[in-house]
Curated annotation (Swiss-Prot):
The protein's name: RNA-binding protein Hfq
Subunit (UniProt): Homohexamer.
Presence of keyword RNA-binding: yes
InterPro entries, per the entry: Hfq, LSM_dom_sf, Sm
Keywords in alphabetical order: RNA-binding, Stress response
GO molecular function, one term: RNA binding
Source organism: Pectobacterium carotovorum subsp. carotovorum (strain PC1)
Region Disordered: start-end pairs: 64-99
Length: 99
């Protein structure tokens, strides 16, 4: 499995599994919204009032409506969607709150 897939797949799977609403921005600037129904190596099925097959090569950014947790193969277990360790992320949030 390619390194890119090892981050991409757990992230997309968490969004799919938790039915998190997402905004997907395409490289041409179009914004699509919905829930990830399914995905593979090349496409994402995005469901709103209809299902749309969106080719990954046309996607610029995937923005969840809320943070999601996903597990990777990295030592330390869980990470949030920014790719940070959950404990480090919590400490960072506490430091921000203290300011």
């Amino acid at each position: 499995m390619a390194k890119g897939q090892s981050l991409q797949d757990p992230f997309l799977n968490a969004l799919r599994r938790e039915r998190v609403p997402v905004s997907i921005y395409l490289v041409n600037g179009i914004k699509l919204q919905g829930q990830i129904e399914s995905f593979d190596q090349f496409v994402i099925l995005l469901k709103n009032t209809v299902s749309q097959m969106v080719y990954k090569h046309a996607i610029s950014t995937v923005v969840p409506s809320r943070p999601v947790s996903h597990h990777s193969n990295n030592p330390g277990g869980g990470s949030n969607y920014h790719g940070n360790n959950t404990a480090a992320s919590q400490q960072s949030q506490e430091a921000d709150d203290a300011e």
